[in-house]
Amino acid sequence: MRLHPPQQIERFTSGGWWTGDTVDGLFRAQVSARPDAIAIVDPLNKPSLMDGAARRLTWAQLGAEADRIAAVLLETGVAQGDVVAVQLPNSVELAVTFLAVARIGAVVTPLPVQYREYELAQAIRLAAVKVLVTAERVGDRDNAEIVRRLDVPAPPIVLAWGDPARDLETAVADPAMLAAHLKGLETDPNDCLTICWTSGTEATPKGVPRCHYDWFAVESNTTAAPSLHGGDVVLNPFPMVNMAGIGGVFLPWLRTGFQMVQHHPFDLLVYLDQITEERVTYTLAPPALLTMLLRKPEMLERYDISSLTRIGSGSAPLPPWMVRGWQERYGIAVINFFGSNEGIALLSDPVNIPDPEERARFFPRPGVPGGAWPGTLAASSVKLVDPASGEEITEPGRPGELHLSGPTVFAGYLAGTADADPFDEDGYLITGDVFEIDGPDGRYLRYVDRAKDLIIRGGMNIAPAELESLLAGHPAVVEVAIVGYPDGVLGERVCAVVAPRDDVDLPSLVDFLKEKGIASYKLPERLEIVEALPRNAVGKILKRDLRERL
């Protein structure tokens, strides 16, 4: 599946923003250049996540593993362009499977391990998944068996690490089949590489296809901003299912060859242990966590974080005092990222915005007269649009919805998964995020708010409309609104605001959603009872009023 039109390819390849790089090409280059260097390290708690001991693989060992699984996939019937779903925790096995799928020219659709029957069935149907790779056990859940029992029109073949019948850890297939396949394989950087899933304001998740071209345009920024290199040790706490895990760590890893240390699920003590024991030099962390650690320095006293020189953060506004605090107290530069699966790739790094408080508040404004921003920002353009009038905003201090064009932007949603065209009449991505022009000479953008109602809990997007549509079927519910409320660790948690028909409590709502097979991270953790939901003159629920009450 080729994604971008020829004129787009010509525009960005002629400018050098898109190159011929592919995932398999960079991977093979690292295997050749540094065969004996450690490539990847499993989480310390891997035995609690899935079967199999924690491993440390060199690039040569990783290459051999990826080839072995690639041959197994071919033997199973996977062909170039077929979609392979991968539902695994951050682990060696996840990286091996991703690389094996890319090796044979198939498409990866990575699924969060929290997905249950409801979300799995949607993804399998919408992406026409041919094979699903998982672990026989994920935590205390018999995950492979759950997938095998799914009632879907075209059930995928299930391959599992830890499967008693055919364990992917030891499964072998004819390597000659792989050699023959690779000999005839023609990979184009415009080929679809992944289909990630994003929760918008619609009830159904949207599929986000991305190719090598636009993925590596993102990578050029996420590698350059923290100045990543082959000598780094990078701790990855974000699931490799979306922009943060794939664009922020996985692809820079393939570009530079640093040592990638996997972490899953997020556990603060394990996270700090890994920084200490692995001598981590760079990691990612949500702003709420960095704020908490700065306010409670005693939590860091028994850990040695002296190897850590920079941290990437984002997904929510960064408190300026926090960014300055990490710089002044620990000598650690915090890099401010603002991204999305669709291709927003704004960042503020210490080179281009040295002042830590400005770095927390501002992002470079692409296309500003006299500006000379680095990387793909130089090939990007933005406009702020008044959502009510459609007028373009050019003066500072006036909020507008961000519209974005550039080499990091995707080509459009997977067919059948979006209600509306994500692009405006000029071909700009309509982001749904509100910014203002700010700073000296209007050089910067300042984030204001989310135009959409998404809840971001621990870096995972939750669509209120999805939960609302399900809870509307609860016999005790007259009407319901789902909103987020602040949390010091996760950023936000989920609250259900219910106008009830009969007595209703939080456990009954949670049990109702669990029966639907909903992922646990989406479950409400708070219930507010109201006589009626507040609405405006045209009947729209006033969610801002509800959030203010919380």
Regions found by a protein language model. Give the residues of each.
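Conserved AMP-binding/adenylation subdomain of ANL enzymes
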Residues: 216-233, 241-282, 290, 296-297
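Gly/Ser/Thr-rich phosphate-binding loop
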Residues: 280-285, 298-367, 381
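AMP-binding/adenylate-forming catalytic core of the ANL superfamily
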Residues: 115-122, 132-134, 283, 406, ...
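Conserved ATP/PPi-binding loop(s) of AMP-dependent carboxylate-activating enzymes
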Residues: 372-381, 389-422, 462, 504
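Conserved pre-ATP/AMP-binding loop-to-beta segment of ANL
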Residues: 20, 35-38, 159-163, 175-197, ...
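ANL superfamily adenylate-forming
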Residues: 5, 44-55, 138-189, 199
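Structural core segment of the AMP-binding/adenylate-forming
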Residues: 75-76, 106-170, 501-504
